[in-house]
Amino acid sequence: MRNALRPVLFRFVLLCLLLPLAGCGFQPLYGSKAEGGSGAAVALNQVAIANIPNRDGQVLRNLLTDRLYQNGKPTEPLYRLAVEMRQSETALGIRRDATASRTRLDMLAHYVLRRASDNKVLIDSNAETSVSFNQLVAQYATVTARDDARGRALHELSEQIMTRLALYFGTTQP
């Protein structure tokens, strides 16, 4: 009898914990707004991404493109996103022969979102991340580890930029 009541009690407690969320104004980030206005997902599809120099910039632009253009590239975008990147490497672990055994890769992306109609700056912000990788004796392994670290850093930068854009479009009417 006792085990039979456990699922019912669990559901009741879960309902009691989730019930306050209904009144707090919580809404999905990428959902459409309750007033019938466009949500973040619609606005994100109207952002044109400027070319970003160098290979890492190209990869970051492709990651952003994959996330922004769920319904295809806009023909007349309402917003323009410009991104500038900087990166640096710092040796963390030093071997007895004065070579690095571990390296930290820092990447910073400065991005500006402008309204296309009047060139007004809507967002002017930075995204930054740090990843590390091992410097191995085998050169190919080090190159592979560095490339993997770059990929992780670029993915993190794209996630930060996307989240910031979605929050902006989800909370304001530009």
Residue ranges and their predicted role:
Residues 1-13:
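Bacterial N-terminal signal peptides that target proteins for export
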Residues 71-126, 131-148:
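Surface-exposed short loop/turn segments
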